[in-house]
UniProtKB/Swiss-Prot annotation:
Transmembrane segments: none annotated. This is Sulfate adenylyltransferase subunit 2. The gene is cysD. GO terms for molecular function: ATP binding; sulfate adenylyltransferase (ATP) activity. Pathway: Sulfur metabolism; hydrogen sulfide biosynthesis; sulfite from sulfate: step 1/3. It catalyses: sulfate + ATP + H(+) = adenosine 5'-phosphosulfate + diphosphate.
């Protein structure tokens, strides 16, 4: 038996995550791993490749594409799929595309609900997945802090925060009826700093957007938004400036704020994490739609 007392804290976290990944594959018929292309997804993919090496991944990766992701994210996603040879499923809500749902005209709440939440539910119904891996961590946001590692979802993919299953030690309740599912979070006990240290130690590839670089940005409601393509509406009083910025978290580019930074290497990012006093999700505009907005989104089926 593995003596966890002799492991570093990162190796303990790694061992726990690998145990969860293997447990799910043993218990469920049709698991899938969400792949948002961010740093947490990069770590989760790396852990999965380790967990089942030398075999190929026993489940596909799913990316819900809103068509508003950073161009570099899509390029990186396709590159990683080709390098590692995993099965990549990409789904976009066709109704949202038909209605031209976008964050500028319809706002972040409607855009997130239709293109992300409904898009995800469509994909899960289409492929009939009964377990879905996600890269959420408890230190990210208050609604995620109280969520279990095995998070039960009903037939409509809804979460009831008042009716969660107990988790004693490393024992997980995987019982589901037909049509129900479990969202599984192998990185629940990791912190943002843990993620960056692990990426550095393991040499995990990540999207270049995480590193500081001179990028074209405009300021909207006090948030620096990168001008990633010609769809960005620029008002008369707004000026596009080249600034040294990076991203602590990634999503749809019109809803993701950049932070001023000079960190161009992993050690510099880690140093920045040690000194920062702000949340990594401060730049995610979807978190600020209303009070408790993330919990409401999760109850409706969001990850």
């Amino acid at each position: 038996m593995l003596d966890t007392k002799k492991l570093t804290h990162l190796k303990q976290l790694e061992a726990e995550s690998i145990h969860i990944l293997r447990e799910v594959v043993a218990e469920f018929d049709n698991p899938v791993m969400m792949y948002s292309v961010g740093k947490d997804s990069a770590v989760m993919l790396h852990l999965a490749l380790k967990a089942f090496f030398p075999a190929k991944l026993p489940f596909p990766l799913l990316h819900v594409d809103t068509k508003w992701k950073f161009k570099e994210m899509i390029e990186f996603r396709d590159k990683r799929a080709k390098e590692e040879g995993f099965e990549l499923l990409v789904h976009t809500n066709p109704e949202g595309i038909e209605k031209n749902i976008n964050p500028f005209v319809h706002g972040s709440a409607v855009h997130t609900d239709i293109m992300k939440t409904e898009g995800l539910k469509q994909a899960l119904n289409k492929y009939k997945f009964d377990a879905v891996f996600g890269g959420a961590r408890r230190d990210e946001e208050k609604s995620r802090a109280k969520e279990r590692i095995y998070s039960f979802r009903d037939k409509n993919h809804r979460w009831d925060p008042k009716n969660q299953r107990p988790e004693l030690w490393n024992l997980y309740n995987s019982k589901v009826h037909k049509g129900e599912s479990i969202r599984v979070f192998p990185l629940s006990n990791w912190t943002e700093l843990d993620i960056w240290q692990y990426i550095y130690l393991e040499g995990i590839p990540i999207v270049p957007l995480y590193f500081a670089k001179r990028r074209p940005v405009i300021e909207k409601d006090g948030v620096k938004i990168m001008v990633d393509d010609e769809r960005m509406p620029i008002e008369e009083h707004e000026v596009v400036k080249e600034e040294m910025v990076r991203f602590r978290t990634l999503g749809c580019y019109p809803l993701t704020g950049a932070v001023e930074s000079s960190a161009t290497t992993l050690p510099e990012i880690i140093q920045e994490m040690l000194l920062t006093k702000t949340s990594e999700r401060q730049g995610r505009m979807i978190d600020n739609d209303s009070s408790g907005s993330m919990e409401k989104k999760k109850i409706e089926g969001y990850f």
